[in-house]
């Protein structure tokens, strides 16, 4: 598949500077791109790579400085434009409408004729698979679960009983939707067997709304009662844990190894960077940003940016980190002052 640069510009709404008739055959990073590849440049850190690149065309921001003779495609959002161009060369997987004979489909399950179910997948009683959805090997869709249209379920995904997955959802390998929430009541008697943690039935479900992507080995626990919910357009990275009854608003970004404890609610467009930990029963407002490894122990107001453990306003955290770097020097200065003070005291005590 090839496109002229002018065709690409019309597709993404960019402005060509240079040869619009250039034939583009693929996408590549700046360092590896050749004369018929398109790459992108939006971070000044990679300025030298941009200048040295052999790429036939580079997608840049509107105000980027362009080396002489360089063909570029100016776009208001270079990364987004490049992503759209890359999709043209690497379109989403299309379903091959069939049910593999090695798949296990319960007679009461409803699989749309345009869906694809690959070998060793299993679809349980009363489960529903929507139009054009692709179910890879090893996927288990349990009893009464519903999966919408145009979804992509990669190998070894598990969707537990009665859980709901919307349209255009991507579930990466090994993720689990609707595993039991972590709920136990301590029983000191244990009905004659000694003290024990009595399992609280997790009778609710998990709901994944439209246009969500969930990364590999992420776990979305079902609710104790009601629903755990992942809002429309939210993207969740690998190895994320959402506890029972957590609610994520639309368009959140949850980066790898984040853990969110039960019944916490996140608003719209919240960003949790890697390894953020959030305790249960909190409210995190719209547009909140949480820096990597932050420990969130209280509610966060809409629009705030927080960092550190326990989390504090990001500007305060930066100041505290700057002060922390000065501690070795301050410690030496204090020791010198203490020695000087001791000398002064000794001299004063020795006078008649």
Swiss-Prot record:
Q: In which pathway does it act?
A: Bacterial outer membrane biogenesis; LPS lipid A biosynthesis
Any S-S bridges, and between which cysteines? none
Protein EC:
2.3.1.191
Name the InterPro entries for this protein. Hexapep (IPR001451), LpxD (IPR007691), Trimer_LpxA-like_sf (IPR011004), UDP_GlcNAc_AcTrfase_non-rep (IPR020573)
GO terms for cellular component: membrane
- Active-site residue list: 244
Query: What's its catalytic activity?
Result: a UDP-3-O-[(3R)-3-hydroxyacyl]-alpha-D-glucosamine + a (3R)-hydroxyacyl-[ACP] = a UDP-2-N,3-O-bis[(3R)-3-hydroxyacyl]-alpha-D-glucosamine + holo-[ACP] + H(+)
Query: Molecular function terms in GO for this entry?
Result: N-acyltransferase activity
- Pfam families for this protein: Hexapep, LpxD
Q: Which GO terms describe its biological process?
A: lipid A biosynthetic process
Name the keywords, alphabetized. Acyltransferase, Lipid A biosynthesis, Lipid biosynthesis, Lipid metabolism, Repeat, Transferase
Could you give the subunit structure recorded for this chain? Homotrimer.
Similarity comment: family membership: Belongs to the transferase hexapeptide repeat family. LpxD subfamily.
Function comment = Catalyzes the N-acylation of UDP-3-O-acylglucosamine using 3-hydroxyacyl-ACP as the acyl donor. Is involved in the biosynthesis of lipid A, a phosphorylated glycolipid that anchors the lipopolysaccharide to the outer membrane of the cell.
Output this protein's name. UDP-3-O-acylglucosamine N-acyltransferase
């Amino acid at each position: 598949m090839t496109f002229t640069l002018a065709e690409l510009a019309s597709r993404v709404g960019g402005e060509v500077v240079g040869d619009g008739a250039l034939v583009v055959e693929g996408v590549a990073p700046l360092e590896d791109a050749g004369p018929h590849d398109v790459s992108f440049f939006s971070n000044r850190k990679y300025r030298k790579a941009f200048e040295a690149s052999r790429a036939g065309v580079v997608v840049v921001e509107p105000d980027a400085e362009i080396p002489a003779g360089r063909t570029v495609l100016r776009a208001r959002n270079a990364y987004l434009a490049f992503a759209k161009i890359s999709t043209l060369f690497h379109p989403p997987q299309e379903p091959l409408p069939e049910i593999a004979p090695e798949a296990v489909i319960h007679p009461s399950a409803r699989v749309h004729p345009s869906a694809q179910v690959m070998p060793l997948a299993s679809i349980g009683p009363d489960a529903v698979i929507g139009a054009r959805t692709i179910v890879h090997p090893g996927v288990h869709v349990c009893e009464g679960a519903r999966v919408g249209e145009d979804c992509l379920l990669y190998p070894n995904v598990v969707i537990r009983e009665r859980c709901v997955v919307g349209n255009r959802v991507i579930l990466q390998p090994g993720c689990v939707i609707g595993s039991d929430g972590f709920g136990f009541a301590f029983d000191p008697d244990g009905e004659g067997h000694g003290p024990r943690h009595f399992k609280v039935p997790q009778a609710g479900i998990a709901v994944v709304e439209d246009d969500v992507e969930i990364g590999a080995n992420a776990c979305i626990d079902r609710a104790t009662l009601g629903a755990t919910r992942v809002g429309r357009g939210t993207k969740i990275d690998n190895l994320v844990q959402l506890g029972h009854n957590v609610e994520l608003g639309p368009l959140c970004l949850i980066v790898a190894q984040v853990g969110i404890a039960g019944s916490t609610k996140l608003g719209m467009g919240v960003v949790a960077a890697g390894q953020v930990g959030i305790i249960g029963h909190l409210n995190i407002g719209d547009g909140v940003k949480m820096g990597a490894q932050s420990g969130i122990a209280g509610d966060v107001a809409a629009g705030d940016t927080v960092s550190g453990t326990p989390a504090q306003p990001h500007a305060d955290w930066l100041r505290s980190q700057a002060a922390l770097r000065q501690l070795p020097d301050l410690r030496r200065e204090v020791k010198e002052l203490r020695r000087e003070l001791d000398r002064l005291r000794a001299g004063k005590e020795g006078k008649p």
